[in-house]
Amino acid sequence: MTPEVARRMNRLNESFYRDNARSFDQTRQTAWPGWERCLCIGHTTGALPRYGGVRVLDVASGNLRLARYLAERLPGVRVSYHGIDSCPMLARGVRLPEGWDVTLQDLDVVGTLLDKKLEEDLGAPGGDLGVPLEGGAADLVACFGFFHHVPTTEARRRLLQELLSYTRTGGLCCVSLWRPMSDRRIAKRARESTRAGLRSLGLSEKELDKGDYLLGWQGRLDTWRYCHHFDEEEIDWLVRAAQGTAELTARFCADGKAGDLNSYLVLTRS
């Protein structure tokens, strides 16, 4: 995928969430089963205390449903929560516990990654997203339902490194990687919508990378979003990319009717 097409895919997604924020929010209200397993791992390893204080960085926080889930599951914990998203309207009206220290940052993460990668030689990761975390690195860095919106393998690698750079030593970095082609119904729809999307946008299939798709929304053919399917080979590659910075604590599939719609990586910062 060329830099120009990658930027276009990001603009496509930015427009999609801006134009469909209300209807999208209505379909994203419940927690995912995979989150519970991540939380259990955090308790078991001691990375997440059941009492006291914990710092959380939520990248692609959307309508704050992860924050709401944590509020229910960690009632005795003082949480310092920093959420990042480029569609702030999704979080409007959401109330979190009064005892929490909450900051929300409006940031186009994908655009930042693409611009940095294409225009600068960044060298080693070290917080290039410019996240102003209070009190240092986070105990839990979570990025759920977002990696599949990041075009190019290199940008996805950089995102994982960025997430780890904001994770404290011994803390957890938890990410989900979408696997839509594991569901026959979703896979069929993805292939059909991609063909329609390419025609609508005047693009050819060769301009996308392996595993890239264009999805519509609620039967409409005038709005598109870029998505990527993660196969086992690419997930293996991401795990290797984290070596030297973090240890793989868990890797599992969860979510969806068959329990395999997302692949999760739980990484402990070295």
Task: Name each model-derived stretch.
Residues M1-V54, N63-V131, C174-S270:
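Class I (Rossmann-like) S-adenosyl-L-methionine-dependent methyltransferase catalytic domain
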Residues A60:
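Conserved S-adenosyl-L-methionine
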Residues T167-C173:
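Short glycine-dipeptide loop
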